[in-house]
């Protein structure tokens, strides 16, 4: 693969190969010395036109664990504030010898455009509400650890589905790996359609006999219309101990973060043994190591 923008055109075999590499990288991270020279001599730029904590730090750590040089770009302190375009920003980084670009933007399509501007590998770190492929990969990896397989498993995704790039990429990838994906939320926060998923305004339908549950926050920063009343949302859609009892016993809980405790998820559940939130973060580094390795070393071998 030359870039990672979304999962259009991906085969199940390609995804499984990438996740196999992530398992190797997970073993590296469990060593006393958590570093290998696999990307020595390469330069990775994290280009975030939108704020991020987990994705940016995770990618930077992943690159450093493989001995790559890392350039961290922050829009707030860049020449974007002086009117420079995304294109000219990326061309400047290319002139400095960057090999891979992890790009996040609040507008959909920016990573796709970047592939026409620069020669290096482009990784979508999240673009608007469209896609977040590495989050989907780390979620799939975490679920495979917990469940053994996704074939025939029911995965419930609950929350603000309409504005969620995590839901879009997650439904696409999990269904590709054989899961049955049910997305539940208020009618005003459900899209008209979502490839790979069954949409329902009934939380109980999504949770019933679910093998795993992923909870999403309300993305108020993306809401132009359809803003729900917080108290009403909590009353009808918060994942609580009582509601989670509809799922299979010990069904794991996931959350991509950032989490609003006691809004989308009951606080006690966030800290329970069923919560895999911290495991998701740990696995995110390994998965992103695998992505960088496939893109950079794979290119060199091609």
From Swiss-Prot:
Q: What does this protein do?
A: Catalyzes the condensation of carbamoyl phosphate and aspartate to form carbamoyl aspartate and inorganic phosphate, the committed step in the de novo pyrimidine nucleotide biosynthesis pathway.
| Assigned GO CC terms | cytosol
| Family designation | Belongs to the aspartate/ornithine carbamoyltransferase superfamily. ATCase family.
Listed under subunit, the entry gives:
Heterododecamer (2C3:3R2) of six catalytic PyrB chains organized as two trimers (C3), and six regulatory PyrI chains organized as three dimers (R2).
The record ties this protein, via Pfam families, to:
OTCace (PF00185), OTCace_N (PF02729)
The EC category is transferase
A GO BP term, please? 'de novo' pyrimidine nucleobase biosynthetic process
The pathway this protein participates in, as annotated, is:
Pyrimidine metabolism; UMP biosynthesis via de novo pathway; (S)-dihydroorotate from bicarbonate: step 2/3
Please indicate if the UniProt record lists Transferase as a keyword: yes
Q: What reaction gets catalysed by this protein?
A: carbamoyl phosphate + L-aspartate = N-carbamoyl-L-aspartate + phosphate + H(+)
- Enzyme Commission number(s): 2.1.3.2
Q: Which PANTHER family match?
A: ASPARTATE CARBAMOYLTRANSFERASE (PTHR45753:SF6), ORNITHINE CARBAMOYLTRANSFERASE, MITOCHONDRIAL (PTHR45753)
Key words of the record: Pyrimidine biosynthesis, Transferase
Molecular-function GO term, any one: amino acid binding
- Positions with a binding annotation for L-aspartate: 82, 165, 217
Q: What is this protein called?
A: Aspartate carbamoyltransferase catalytic subunit
Report residues binding carbamoyl phosphate.
54-55, 104, 132, 135, 257-258
InterPro entries registered for this protein in UniProt: Asp/Orn_carbamoyltranf_P-bd, Asp/Orn_carbamoylTrfase, Asp/Orn_carbamoylTrfase_sf, Asp_carbamoyltransf, Asp_carbamoyltransf_Asp/Orn-bd
